[in-house]
């Protein structure tokens, strides 16, 4: 029984306090003194008016709401507030006097103008909101209606009323005002009472929002409601708290927060709070609070909060069930015949149905929770711990964030303490979680009707709990007269007589004491255990065969104990792999425990090693997130198994299993301790019952009394039931017995912890240990790594900065154990005396154990070493040498799964045992797989030293010994990863020496120290200048170029030039690029004389060598001018080759010979160069052979010269030339004008003018130009644009941002200045379907020259309209972006470890790298520039410094537009010209020099090769080289095997003497050139040749740049573990290698022709070559067998092609032939995808790799010839009128512009041509009129005639549009001829 009301309070407006805000004060309170058991709530006046005490000018309705207050003991107090407004006349004294005077004068009483609030407050510990509303309403009614009832009686009756708490009883009572009220108590006080609040909350916010709030509360987030109704706030908070039942909210719960306490919202603790909507402006700044708007029906979740959702499938099931309950009409909404009426449940029942859904949810979440309760003590109070890790593990939700947070919260801790005891009152949830969970699961899997039925059953019980008596007694409560609050004259609420009320209260209390009712006895019972914990996800779909794996583990253990070493070695790898599964680990512990019970724990050395390895393997997966079951089961086994080291010394297994983080995890020790204590308590009470009561009371105890199957919870329930009946002495004995049990167990665990934490050797070196990642002593889950002896000293104590010693280790272990003892003993109720005695005991235990271990360690070192595999030395390249001693290592698996078997199947090649070798060129691992089944194979993984991008020290889980060891992880730019763990015999000094040597060869002091200059050479080393030896950076200033070159002994430059004094201007190349890398700037100054225009005799030798360079040979091929003085130049030449830069005085990063306009003098080039970064002025690089458009490249503009560029139309009125800047700007203008003059000649010859619109570009101006061509009005040439949001892209915003990626550039024919629009990266989803939408963004004319420059530099440029030149602003990605993208690409393709997140897939990682996005932009820009040049416009590219993106784009444009560059010779010339001569910074970008050591690898050249690979994929017949050639270049441009890519420019190569070579003197040559190497290979083998090569003379290639068409380059992924990378091989195999191959060949013949091919191990294209390569190899083999001279493969290939043509001609003579005899056309149409050729290993090259088609494809070639007969430019159906019978028949017509024919066939599938019209004979193509017999329904305009010299052909198309198209096509074909 309890008081209905603890306090009644009257609170009114405080007139005494002044200020802007009003205040309230307590006018009266009853009782006047505090109850002893219930203190008076402080600050009640704040909560009466949560919005503040404010006066009102209106008469307001009385309001009612309930405020919930929580006291210091966490008890709730419900404050019901009824507020009404009183007329307030006496505001100020003067006003009152004035009003009284007026009343006397007028004789009238004036109505009040101001009203003050007054609150009647009822404070109670009971939650009866409707009773409170009725009681306060009754008091207000008595006051407002002036009833003849004493308020004093009402209040005293209210305060003294006694009501039952729970149990479902009813009580009638009256306050004495004619009222009759009924209190209905709920059946269970543990079940929340909600009324209709839950249903109301779902109506206000909806299902999804309420579920979000539900998750937020359970995961301890802050939730804030706001509404304009205080009652709604209270209901919402009540509903949300009720939804989390059976949990109880244990954080601040304030349904209505007063305005004065809003700062509470900034508290760091979670809360549920409600505030009035008037405070919205003050709550929106809260960053970590989830705000729910009850009136608007929305919730706002801040970005910083990640809400953990309910785990699936529970979330889906809950949403479906809520939808069933709240929206029952959904089921019949689609019915054709809707039911007459759908029964709508009452809102009170609906409320309970919604709660039933959440009850079902919690029953499923907490299913089996009682099986994870750990009972530590029973008496005097039960102490229960929850095994959270076991629960999560068994439920399969270890990684689930939601449940982890729920179980870690305070609410769940209260749930365990309240519901953990096995003997207590039970409620609805206990029954549900124990018996109904399986039914819930079945219902969810079957149909909705069963779900709804169960929900309604639960709802009925919840409803019955709130309304236990269906027949309610009659209630009567007087209510105020309607509108009574609007009365004009109302007397104020009268003040009650305090003494009278107090007397009446005392009288009532006396009566209650006389008739006191006994409290309701709680009915306790044994809590049912319920169903066990099961996984929340059905695991029926598991692919693993657990039974077979368990059998493997059992057999292996059996072989170990039976000492069958051979069988053990065979099964051990499989058993270790099986131990990855939990069931196998459980099996291991059970089997080992059986052998311990059989006293077979003493093992020999071999058995001991096997058992320890299996233990370590089982332990390595027991991380902090698991349930620790395996580790706890292995704990006693590790202290049982041992081996004898000597007569008196034994070594236990625990000394060898210390390398696991689980032992350093305090949570593990606590959980294991509590589990063992629980078992000991169970044994204690089982023993007590069997011993004491078994004989005397056998019948009373029954069958279960001595049943060993009884759980500890069963025993505890019985003990708790009997506890009140026991005597004090017996109770005290039980308490002491339990404490002794806990104390003895604490001593036992202290010993166990000493065993596992004290290392075998405290003086062990630190090689295999690293510092802890966290505070070890805090019990974190950081992995503690140590040596095989188990030293964890560094991790134990992070406080001391001194070196670890034995004493430090002992102290650290003591501190760790002491903290553990303190925690578990305090929680277990152990007395302080026992805890102190344990503290004294621990140091002694540690000291004794350390002393014991000294002998063990001493004896263990005398054991003979384990026999290890023999180290196999790898084959080396010519000139390659070993640098240091090989390190024995274990090659550990990385994140790639291919070689590890597992889910992908295949052999377990990794891990492999072997050695790591360091040579002058590579790091090589060579070894054998540890798995005995593939142990005969050889594993090789190698990395060129120069390509290493990162090496770091790591801790590796040794897969052989299952312990942590130090390792090394080496990542390479060749997409390789070497991850090794060092063997025990490898000392720290050996590792340090290895790393020092590695860094020495990674960054050699000089390029002549690189492997490229040492490979197989016997010439003496060249002595470089001293300054070169001191400064490894090549950014030095050479006094004269000649000195460096002469010292290198490579070339002779004119002596006059060397000896001449400096007379020229000193030019400085100062890189001032904005936003670029400082590392990209070159700060070298030119101190050399500027040579004159005529060549001196002494420089002829230099010129002779320069003209042999690739640049000049390409200039000659393109007819770009000659090197001659002005008197001998041809006037027809518009460009010339200047030798001004032959000594690199003009620009150090440019080649010696440059192509410039004919009219520009050499003297002006110096000034022009100043306007560009690093003096890289624009020069001609290539000319389109068809349109004569030229491609120019240069560096970006200097910002200071941009301002003065083309300021006005009149260039002669520029600033005077006295200033260096102004003169440079003038020369720049002149240079550009000269370029335009030279370009315009060809541009006009192509039929272009400044105002014409190219039809091929499909440009149609949006509006007519208002100014003429010669207009003097200055116009912006940069068109309007839409800014893109992509940062750091090649083209963001500017003119680019208006266009999105179209389907294919070839077909769209988009206008010319949509360039950068296609480069917008993140808008690829948008595709314009109408060209008019694009043209509104484009220029209205085509210019002769387009200058592509940086947007930042070109902003504000203004040009004369007549210049016929336009700027195109481009934004490009900086170097930092490319680096980042490459790193992400490397991590995606070559991950270092398996991803922990299941969502981290390979494709997702590739997408996040944005590598394809960058490739897309480069190709797209190149395609558009190529289109511009095809249309006759020239292009100048001046981006960044001119050596990165510029080089990529310029090279790709030439590949697209010139077939020559798609040959082997042409591609070589392109690389030499654009990349080497024009100064791409290979040394810096590839991180090859010491100066670039900190800059990182930037894959500019690799991106270019990837772009070429993408084009090669789309046009496989257009390239002479195959994709293997590209991979070969990609590998060796960073390998340092060849000298080609070593330096940054021709200037540096000249300075180092490597630019020119004396071909006559072979001994003086240094280093190998990659091009010569490739040429020699190509003469002998077809490894670089593309069998599909069939070039055409059509227009430029137009590849699609859409990301969807780009393909992953296999270079990033492929691996050949049998031989290492297939790019390092030698041309001539040695005799030894040849004999090896012969032996292996004979062996293969004996075994048969079948061979297993493993993609990650074998070179598939070598062991399984295509048909053509196979046939060529066979021919070569037969020639050798017949002792014939081998024929060159090129001749053989040509003969084969001729034979194919002859066969095709014969087949063509047969009219019934169904197959077209044309190989090339077949290749073009089908785009056959052929695999690349691979290369052999370093031992042999006879088995040439594949190049083209496989065997199935090769059989098709006999049907095709290479005749070009099937070129189809346009095709379709036309009706043709017969010549003889004049009949109209449909025919399939093909227009062939190559053969100049119009052929026709019977149908589109027909391959036999029925006839053709020679277009050379066509005279006219004209529209025609319909004739007799024409096809029906034909359009009159669909007819046209083709008149030839022989006859007139009549045609009819399908419609007028098609007819016009055919006429245009034929007309264009005729005009082009």
Curated annotation (Swiss-Prot):
Organism per entry: Xenopus laevis
Subcellular location: Cytoplasm; Membrane
Name of the protein: Myotubularin-related protein 13
GO biological process, one term: autophagy
Membrane protein topology class: Peripheral membrane protein
GO CC annotation terms, alphabetical: cytoplasm; membrane
Chain ranges of the PH domain: 1767-1871
PANTHER family named among the record's database cross-references: MYOTUBULARIN-RELATED, MYOTUBULARIN-RELATED PROTEIN 13
Cross-referenced SMART domains: dDENN, DENN, GRAM, PH, uDENN
Annotated cDENN domain residues: 190-323
Molecular-function annotations in GO: guanyl-nucleotide exchange factor activity
InterPro entries documented for this protein: cDENN_dom, dDENN_dom, DENN_C, GRAM, MTMR13_PH-GRAM, Myotubularin, Myotubularin-like_Pase_dom, PH-like_dom_sf
């Amino acid at each position: 029984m309890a008081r209905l009301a603890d306090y009644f309070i009257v609170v009114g407006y405080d007139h005494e306090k002044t200020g802007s805000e009003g205040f309230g004060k307590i006018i009266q309170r009853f009782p006047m003194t505090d109850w002893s058991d219930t203190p008076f709530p402080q600050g009640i006046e704040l909560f009466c008016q949560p919005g503040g005490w404010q006066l009102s000018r209106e008469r307001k309705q009385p309001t009612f709401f309930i405020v919930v207050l929580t006291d210091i003991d966490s008890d709730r107090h419900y404050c019901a507030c009824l507020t009404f407004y009183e007329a307030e006349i006496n505001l100020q004294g003067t006003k009152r006097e004035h009003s009284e005077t007026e009343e006397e004068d007028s004789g009238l009483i004036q109505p009040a103008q101001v009203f003050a609030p007054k609150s009647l407050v009822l404070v109670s510990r009971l939650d009866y909101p409707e009773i409170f509303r009725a009681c306060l309403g009754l008091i207000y009614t008595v006051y407002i209606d002036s009833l003849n009832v004493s308020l004093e009686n009402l209040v005293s009756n209210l305060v003294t009323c006694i009501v039952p708490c729970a149990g479902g009883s009813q009580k009638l009572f009256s306050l004495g005002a004619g009222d009759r009220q009924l209190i209905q108590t709920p059946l269970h006080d543990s079940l929340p009472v909600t009324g209709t609040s839950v249903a109301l909350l779902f109506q206000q916010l909806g299902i999804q929002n309420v579920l979000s709030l539900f998750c937020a509360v359970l995961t301890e987030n802050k939730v804030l409601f706001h509404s304009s109704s205080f009652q709604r706030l209270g209901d919402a908070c009540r509903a949300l708290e009720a939804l989390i039942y059976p949990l109880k909210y244990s954080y601040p719960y304030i349904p209505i927060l007063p305005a004065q306490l809003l700062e509470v919202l900034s508290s760091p603790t979670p809360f549920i709070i409600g505030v009035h909507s008037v405070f919205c402006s003050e709550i929106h700044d809260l960053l970590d609070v989830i705000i729910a708007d009850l009136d608007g029906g929305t919730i706002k979740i801040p970005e910083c909060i990640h809400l953990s959702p309910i785990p699936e499938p529970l979330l889906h099931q809950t949403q479906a069930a809520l939808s069933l309950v709240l929206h029952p009409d959904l089921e019949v909404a689609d019915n054709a015949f809707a039911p007459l009426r759908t029964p709508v449940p009452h809102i009170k029942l609906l409320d309970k149905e919604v709660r039933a859904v959440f009850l079902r949810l919690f029953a499923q979440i907490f299913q089996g929770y009682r099986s994870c309760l750990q009972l530590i003590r029973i008496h005097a109070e039960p102490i229960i711990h929850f095994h959270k890790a076991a629960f999560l593990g068994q439920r399969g939700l270890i990684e689930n964030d939601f449940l982890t947070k729920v179980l870690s919260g305070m609410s769940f801790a209260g749930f365990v303490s309240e519901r953990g005891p096995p003997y207590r009152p039970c409620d609805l949830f206990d029954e549900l979680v124990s018996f109904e969970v399986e039914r819930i699961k079945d219902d969810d899997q079957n149909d909705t009707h069963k779900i709804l039925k169960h929900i309604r059953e639960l709802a009925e019980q919840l409803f019955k709990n709130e309304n236990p008596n269906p027949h309610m007694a009659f209630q009567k409560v007087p209510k105020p007269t309607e509108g009574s609050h609007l009365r004009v004259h109302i007397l104020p609420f009268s003040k009650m007589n305090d003494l009278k009320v107090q007397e009446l209260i005392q009288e009532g209390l006396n009566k209650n004491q006389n008739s006191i009712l006994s409290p309701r006895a709680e009915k306790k019972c044994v809590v049912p255990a319920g169903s066990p914990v099961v996984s929340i996800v059905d695991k029926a779909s598991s692919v693993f065969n657990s039974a077979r794996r368990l059998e493997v583990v059992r057999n292996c253990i059996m072989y170990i104990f039976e000492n069958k070493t051979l069988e053990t070695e065979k099964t051990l790898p499989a058993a270790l792999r099986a131990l990855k599964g939990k069931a196998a680990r459980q099996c291991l512990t059970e089997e080992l425990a059986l052998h311990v019970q059989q006293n077979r724990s003493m093992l020999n050395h071999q058995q001991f090693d096997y058992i320890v390895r299996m233990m370590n393997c089982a332990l390595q997966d027991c991380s902090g997130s698991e349930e620790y079951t395996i580790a706890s089961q292995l704990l006693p086994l590790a202290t049982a198994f041992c081996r004898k080291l000597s007569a008196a010394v034994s070594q236990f297994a625990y000394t060898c299993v210390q390398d696991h983080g689980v032992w350093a995890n305090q949570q593990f020790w606590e959980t294991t301790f509590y589990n063992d204590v629980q078992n000991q308590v169970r044994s204690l009470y089982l023993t007590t019952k069997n011993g004491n009561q078994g004989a005397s009371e056998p019948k009373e105890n029954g069958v279960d009394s001595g049943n060993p199957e009884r759980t500890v919870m069963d025993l505890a329930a019985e003990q708790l039931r009997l506890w009140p009946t026991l005597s004090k002495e017996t109770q005290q004995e039980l308490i002491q017995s339990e404490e002794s049990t806990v104390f003895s167990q604490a001593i036992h665990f202290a010993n166990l912890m000493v065993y596992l934490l004290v290392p075998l050797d405290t003086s062990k070196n630190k090689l295999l240990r690293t510092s802890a990642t966290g505070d070890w002593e805090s019990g974190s889950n950081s992995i503690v790594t140590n040596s095989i002896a188990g030293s964890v000293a560094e991790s134990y104590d992070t406080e001391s900065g001194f070196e670890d010693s034995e004493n430090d280790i002992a102290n650290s272990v003591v501190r760790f154990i002491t903290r553990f003892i303190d925690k578990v003993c305090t929680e277990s109720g152990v007395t302080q005396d026992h805890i102190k005695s344990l503290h004294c005991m621990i140091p002694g235990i540690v000291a004794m154990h350390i002393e014991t271990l000294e002998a063990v360690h001493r004896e263990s070192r005398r054991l003979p070493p384990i026999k290890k595999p023999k180290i196999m030395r790898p084959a080396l390249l010519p000139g390659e040498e070993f640098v240091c001693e090989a390190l024995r290592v274990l090659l550990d698996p990385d994140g790639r799964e291919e070689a590890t078997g597992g889910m992908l199947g295949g052999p377990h090649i990794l891990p492999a045992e072997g050695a790591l070798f360091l040579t002058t060129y590579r790091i090589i691992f060579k070894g054998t797989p540890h798995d005995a089944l593939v142990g005969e194979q050889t594993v090789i993984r190698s990395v060129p030293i120069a390509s290493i991008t990162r090496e770091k020290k790591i801790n590796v889980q040794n897969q052989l010994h299952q312990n942590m060891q130090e390792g090394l992880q080496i990542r390479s730019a060749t997409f390789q990863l070497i991850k090794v763990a060092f063997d025990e015999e490898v000392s720290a000094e050996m590792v340090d020496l290895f790393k020092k040597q590695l860094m020495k060869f990674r960054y050699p002091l000089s390029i002549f120290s690189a492997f490229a200059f040492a490979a197989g050479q016997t010439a003496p080393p060249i002595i470089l200048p001293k300054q070169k030896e001191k400064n490894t950076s090549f950014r030095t200033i050479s006094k004269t170029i000649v000195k460096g070159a002469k010292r290198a002994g490579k070339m002779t430059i004119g002596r006059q030039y060397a000896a001449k004094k400096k007379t020229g201007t000193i030019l400085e190349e100062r890189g001032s690029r904005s936003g670029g890398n400082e590392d990209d700037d070159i700060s070298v100054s030119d101190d050399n004389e500027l040579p004159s225009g005529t060549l001196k005799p002494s420089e002829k030798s230099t010129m002779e060598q320069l003209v042999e360079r690739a640049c000049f040979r390409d200039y000659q091929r393109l007819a770009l001018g000659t090197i001659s003085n002005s008197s001998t130049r041809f006037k027809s030449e518009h460009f010339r080759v200047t030798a001004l830069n032959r000594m690199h005085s003009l620009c150090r990063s440019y080649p010696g010979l440059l192509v410039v306009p004919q009219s520009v003098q050499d003297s002006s080039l110096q000034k022009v160069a100043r306007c560009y970064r690093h003096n890289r002025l624009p020069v001609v690089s290539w000319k389109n052979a068809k349109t004569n458009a030229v491609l120019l490249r240069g560096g970006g503009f200097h910002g200071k010269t941009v301002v003065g560029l083309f300021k006005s139309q009149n260039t002669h009125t520029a600033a005077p030339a006295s200033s260096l800047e102004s003169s440079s700007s003038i020369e720049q203008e002149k240079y550009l004008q000269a370029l335009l003059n030279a370009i315009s000649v060809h541009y006009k010859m192509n039929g272009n003018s400044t105002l014409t619109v190219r039809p091929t570009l499909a440009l149609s101006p949006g509006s007519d130009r208002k100014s003429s061509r010669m207009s003097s009005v200055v116009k912006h040439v940069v068109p309007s644009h839409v800014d893109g949001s992509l940062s750091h892209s090649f083209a963001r915003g500017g003119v680019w941002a208006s266009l999105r990626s179209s389907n294919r550039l070839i077909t769209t024919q988009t206008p010319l200045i949509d360039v950068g629009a296609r480069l917008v990266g993140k808008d690829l989803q948008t595709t314009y379907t109408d060209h008019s939408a694009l043209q509104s963004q484009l220029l209205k004319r085509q210019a002769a020259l387009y200058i592509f420059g940086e947007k930042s530099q070109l902003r504000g440029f203004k040009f004369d309209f007549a210049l016929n030149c336009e700027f195109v602003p481009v934004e490009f990605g900086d170097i930092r972006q490319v680096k980042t993208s490459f790193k992400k690409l490397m991590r995606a393709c070559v991950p270092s470890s398996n991803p922990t997140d299941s969502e981290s897939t390979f494709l997702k990682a590739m997408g996040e790298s944005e590598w394809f996005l960058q490739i897309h932009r480069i190709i797209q820009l190149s395609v558009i520039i190529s289109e511009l040049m095809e249309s006759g416009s020239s292009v100048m590219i001046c981006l960044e410094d001119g050596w990165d993106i510029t080089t990529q784009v310029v090279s790709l444009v030439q590949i697209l537009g010139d077939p020559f560059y798609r040959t082997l010779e042409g591609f070589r010339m392109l690389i030499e010209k654009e990349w080497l001569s024009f100064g791409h910074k290979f040394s810096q970008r590839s991180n090859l020099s010491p100066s670039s050591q900190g800059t990182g690898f930037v894959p500019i050249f690799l991106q270019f090769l990837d772009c070429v690979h993408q084009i090669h994929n789309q046009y496989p017949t257009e390239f002479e080289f195959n994709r293997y050639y590209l991979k070969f270049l990609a590998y060796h441009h960073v390998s340092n095997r060849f000298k080609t890519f070593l330096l940054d420019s021709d200037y540096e190569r000249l300075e180092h003497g490597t630019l020119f070579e004396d071909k006559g003197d072979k001994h003086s040559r240094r280093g190998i050139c990659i091009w010569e190497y490739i040429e020699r290979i190509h003469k002998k083998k077809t490894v670089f040749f593309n069998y599909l090569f069939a070039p055409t003379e059509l227009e430029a290639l137009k590849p699609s740049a859409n990301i969807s068409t780009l393909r992953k380059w296999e270079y990033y992924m492929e691996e050949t573990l049998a031989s290492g990378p297939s790019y390092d091989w030698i041309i001539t195999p040695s005799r030894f290698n040849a004999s090896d191959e012969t032996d292996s060949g004979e062996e293969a013949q004996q075994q048969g022709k079948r061979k297993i091919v493993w993609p990650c191990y074998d070179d598939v294209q070598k062991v399984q070559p295509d048909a053509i390569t196979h046939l060529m190899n066979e021919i070569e083999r037969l020639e050798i067998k017949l002792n014939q001279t081998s024929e060159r493969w090129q001749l053989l290939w040509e003969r084969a092609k001729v034979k194919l043509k002859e066969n095709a001609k014969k087949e063509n003579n047969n009219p019934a032939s169904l197959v077209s005899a044309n190989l090339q056309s077949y290749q073009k149409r089908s785009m056959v995808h052929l695999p690349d050729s691979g290369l052999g290993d370093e031992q042999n090259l006879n088995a040439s790799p594949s190049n083209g088609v496989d065997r199935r494809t090769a059989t098709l070639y006999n049907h095709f010839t290479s005749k070009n007969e099937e070129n189809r430019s346009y095709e379709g159906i036309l009706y043709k009128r017969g010549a003889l019978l004049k009949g109209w028949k449909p025919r399939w017509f093909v227009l062939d512009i190559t053969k100049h024919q119009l052929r026709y066939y019977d149908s589109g599938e027909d391959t036999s041509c029925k006839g053709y019209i020679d277009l050379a004979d066509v005279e006219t193509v004209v529209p025609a009129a319909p004739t007799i017999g024409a096809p029906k329904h034909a359009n009159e305009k669909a007819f046209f005639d083709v008149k030839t010299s022989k006859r007139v052909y009549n045609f009819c198309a399908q419609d007028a549009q098609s007819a016009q198209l055919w006429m245009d096509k034929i007309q264009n074909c005729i005009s082009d001829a």
